[in-house]
A protein has these predicted regions:
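Charged, solvent-exposed interaction patches on well-folded alpha/beta domains
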Residues: 1-89, 94-264
Length: 264
């Protein structure tokens, strides 16, 4: 069998040259990591335009205060893990991720805790409850959510008022109409609407030690009460006038008890 050494030599040389060219192209076109600096910082916050407390300006300010804002810094000295851990110390941050790219970009991705109700109790406590029924501290920022006042301790706020607020917010009508929850000494619940000069009394929330059934029980309770109120709004107040009554009691089934304003 005749071996064509010339052909084999040519093929081998072609392979060597091809491999070298690929290596050289990759090597000389790759950025010099030692001299690469951060040219842009992308701060992405999930739900930034809703009722959260975070914005890109605040995040930049927080990182600058810790001397961790990466813009203009050598990329090799940008500590992505430290940036993540620093941002996670904020009581308003749920998750934080930071990554670097070879073209000098630093990307920061945040998800935030979303407040669903603000608590202003009779004992002068002032804080928020988030969408996971956990306490958030007060802040200089405000957002358009329900305020709960009255006889509220932190246990009741987390276990019941947060669920009541969620139930109201899931309905577009009540999300726009109800602006305040007031808890009486016996835990009876009053609702203060945006439209209409009256107070709505719905009674006591159903209480249970079964966590998995508590939310459903409160949802059913709220839906039942507010469906009746919606019908009363539609067929009663629309005829009598929105400011005719000062107190509307929908605690009991099959009846609505109203108290007129003194000048009505």
């Amino acid at each position: 069998m005749h071996i064509n050494w010339k052909k084999i030599t040519i093929i081998t040389l072609d392979l060597i040259i091809g491999t070298y060219l690929v290596f050289a192209f990759t090597k000389f076109n790759k950025p010099d990591e030692a001299n690469l600096v951060c040219t842009k910082v992308n701060i992405n916050i999930q739900d930034e335009m809703t009722n959260g407390f975070l914005n890109a300006k605040e995040i930049k300010k927080r990182l600058e205060a810790r001397k961790l804002y990466p813009l203009g810094e050598p990329l090799k000295e940008v500590n992505a893990r430290m940036i993540e851990e620093t941002l996670k110390t904020s009581p308003f941050v749920k998750t934080a991720e930071c990554s670097k790219t070879q073209d000098g970009l630093v990307d920061i991705y945040l998800t935030q805790r979303m407040p669903i109700v603000r608590i202003k109790s009779i004992s002068n406590e002032d804080y928020y409850i988030d969408d996971h029924n956990q306490i958030m501290p007060n802040t200089n920022y405000t957002c358009d959510i329900i305020i709960a006042t009255g006889y509220i301790n932190k246990w009741y706020a987390k276990k019941y008022i947060s669920l009541l607020s969620k139930a109201l917010m899931t309905n577009e009508l009540w999300r726009n109409q109800i602006e305040q929850i007031n808890v009486l000494p016996d835990r009876g619940i009053e609702l203060v609407p945006r439209v209409g000069n009256h107070i709505i009394y719905i009674g006591n929330l159903p209480e249970t030690n079964l966590i998995d059934k508590r939310e459903q029980a409160i949802n059913d309770f709220v839906n039942k009460k507010m469906n009746r109120l919606e019908k009363f709004y539609k067929y009663g107040l629309s005829q009598a006038g929105w400011n005719k009554y000062s107190y509307i009691n929908i605690e009991f089934d099959n009846q609505i008890i109203c108290k007129k304003h003194q000048n009505s």
